[in-house]
Amino acid sequence: LTPETASFPR
């Protein structure tokens, strides 16, 4: 899990 996907857990 990268910080980007953590902001967009879609």
From Swiss-Prot:
The modification Arginine amide is found at R10. The keyword Secreted applies. GO terms for cellular component: extracellular region. It comes from the Eukaryota. Its main location: secreted. It is found in: Secreted. Keywords: Amidation, Secreted. Is not toxic to insects. Has been extracted from the spider web. Is not a smooth muscle agonist. This is Fr.III-4. It comes from Trichonephila clavipes. The lineage of its organism: Eukaryota, Metazoa, Ecdysozoa, Arthropoda, Chelicerata.
